[in-house]
C-alpha cells in the first residue's frame, strides 16, 4: 500500500491515479492525499503527485503525540545497529502543530541513536511538511539511508506513517520545460507535469501510437516518449513542427530513448490520416486551441466572441477526426474555460453537444467532471480536461 501527496489541484492527481490503477485500487485518505493498493504502483510516472510513500505504520485514532511515540519507538529500533549515517526528513500533513513539534520528534530519534552509536542528520523543517524541492535536493526516499517519513492524518483522526519512495523530480521537469532548444510563450506553455497527467488520464500504456494534433513545441510528445509510447505529432504551423522536431531530437540525444516519433504539418480541423496512422493511433492527447490569453476577465462581448471562435475550431477538429479514428480510441483534450471575478467558470458550448459530434464523456468515480480543471490562482483561462470516447457506430 502506498500513500501519495497530491499536487496543487488534488482532484486531477487522483483522477490520474484512478485511470492508471483503477477506482477499486485508489481511494481518498484526506483532502490532499490518496491511498493506492497496486503492485504496479510507479511514482516516477506520475504528474499529479508531489510525493509518495510506502505505508509502514497505521494508527486508528490519534494526534501528533501518538504518532511521534510510534515513530521514535519504531525507528530507533530499526536503525540502532546501522553503520551508515542516516539522513532523515519528517513531513506532517493534516496536523495542527508547529514545525518545532516535528523537529522535536526527529531530535529525539537523533539523541537515542547517538547513544547507540548511529549518526543521523536531520533536515530542518521551516514548515510542518518539507517542500518538494527540499525532499528532491536531499535525495530523500531514493536510498535506504536517505529517508523521509510522511505522517498523514485524515479528518477522522486516522494516521498513516509512510516511508517516501521519492519526490517529484522538479529538476528534470524544469529541464524538459526550459532547457530544451525551442520554447514559445506566445502559443502557451503546457507544463510537462500536466502533459504527463493527461497522458496517464488516457489509461495505462497500451499498444499503438499517441497522436497530438495540436503539438506546438512537442511537450506531450516528449512526455509520452519518456513513458515508452510511440507518437505522432502535427500542427497547423510549420514553425511549431520545426520546433517540435528540434525538441524531439534533443530528447533523443539527452535520454537515449527508443520510442518512434513522427511530426508533420496539418490542420487539425481538416487533416486526413493515412491508412497506417488510422490503424496505429489508439489515443489522442492534446491541448486544443485556448484562444487569446487574458490578464483580467474579459467583457461579456469579448468573451462571447473568443468562446465562439474556440468552440468552432475544437468542434470542427472533433467532427473531422471522428470517422477516421478507431472506435476504441481514448481522447484527452484540454479546452479553455474562462473564470470571472467571482471564480465562476464559463465553459464551451460543445461540452453539452458531444453526442452530436459523435462522442461520449468518460465519467470517473473519485472526482466529478467539474473538478477536472487546471489553473493557477491568477489565471483567467483555465484548461478543462475532457476525457472522451467515440460513440459506438451502431
Q: Which stretches of residues belong to each language-model region?
A:
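Short beta-strand segments enriched in small/hydrophobic residues
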Residues: 89-92
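Short glycine/proline-enriched loop/turn "hinge" motifs that connect secondary-structure elements
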Residues: 76-83
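A gly/proline- and charged-residue-enriched helix-loop-helix capping module
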Residues: 99, 105-106, 110-130
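Class I S-adenosyl-L-methionine-dependent methyltransferase catalytic core
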Residues: 1-75, 94-108, 132-148, 153-394
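Phosphate-coordination loops involved in phosphoryl transfer and adenosine-cofactor binding
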Residues: 84-87, 207
Amino acid at each position: 500500500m502506498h500513500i501519495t501527496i497530491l499536487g496543487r489541484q488534488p482532484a486531477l492527481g487522483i483522477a490520474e491515479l484512478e485511470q492508471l490503477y483503477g477506482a477499486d485500487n485508489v481511494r481518498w485518505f484526506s483532502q490532499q492525499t490518496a491511498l493506492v493498493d497496486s503492485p504496479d504502483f510507479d511514482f516516477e510516472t506520475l504528474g499529479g503527485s508531489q510525493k509518495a510513500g510506502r505505508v509502514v505504520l497505521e494508527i486508528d485514532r490519534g494526534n501528533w503525540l501518538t504518532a511521534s511515540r510510534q515513530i521514535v519507538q519504531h525507528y530507533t529500533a530499526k536503525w540502532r545497529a546501522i553503520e551508515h549515517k542516516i539522513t532523515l526528513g519528517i513531513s506532517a500533513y493534516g496536523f495542527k502543530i508547529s514545525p518545532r513539534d516535528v523537529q522535536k520528534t526527529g531530535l529525539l530519534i537523533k539523541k537515542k541513536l547517538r547513544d547507540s552509536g548511529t549518526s543521523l542528520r536531520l533536515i530542518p523543517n521551516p514548515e510542518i511538511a518539507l517542500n518538494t524541492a527540499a525532499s528532491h535536493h536531499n535525495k530523500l526516499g531514493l536510498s535506504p539511508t536517505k529517508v523521509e517519513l510522511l505522517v498523514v492524518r485524515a479528518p477522522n483522526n486516522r494516521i498513516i506513517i509512510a516511508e517516501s519512495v521519492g519526490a517529484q523530480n522538479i529538476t528534470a521537469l524544469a529541464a524538459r520545460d526550459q532547457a530544451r532548444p525551442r520554447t514559445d510563450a506566445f502559443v502557451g506553455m503546457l507544463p510537462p507535469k500536466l502533459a504527463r497527467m493527461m497522458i496517464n488520464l488516457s489509461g495505462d500504456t497500451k499498444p499503438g501510437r499517441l497522436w497530438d494534433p495540436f503539438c506546438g513545441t512537442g511537450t506531450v510528445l516528449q512526455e509520452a516518449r519518456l513513458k515508452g509510447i510511440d507518437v505522432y505529432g502535427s500542427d497547423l504551423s510549420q514553425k511549431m513542427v520545426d520546433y517540435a522536431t528540434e525538441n524531439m531530437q534533443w530528447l533523443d540525444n539527452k535520454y537515449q530513448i527508443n520510442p518512434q516519433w513522427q511530426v508533420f504539418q496539418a490542420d487539425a480541423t481538416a487533416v486526413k490520416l493515412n491508412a497506417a496512422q488510422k490503424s496505429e493511433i489508439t489515443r489522442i492527447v492534446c491541448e486544443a486551441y485556448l484562444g487569446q490569453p487574458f490578464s483580467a476577465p474579459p467583457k461579456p462581448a469579448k468573451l462571447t466572441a473568443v468562446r465562439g471562435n474556440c468552440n468552432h475550431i475544437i468542434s470542427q477538429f472533433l467532427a473531422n477526426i471522428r470517422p477516421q479514428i478507431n472506435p476504441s480510441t481514448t481522447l484527452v483534450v484540454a479546452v479553455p474555460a474562462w473564470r470571472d471575478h467571482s471564480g465562476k467558470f464559463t465553459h464551451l458550448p460543445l461540452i453539452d453537444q458531444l453526442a452530436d459530434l459523435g462522442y461520449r464523456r468518460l465519467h470517473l468515480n473519485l472526482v466529478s467532471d467539474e473538478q477536472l480543471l487546471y489553473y493557477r490562482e491568477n489565471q483567467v483561462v483555465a484548461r478543462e480536461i475532457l476525457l472522451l470516447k467515440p460513440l459506438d457506430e451502431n
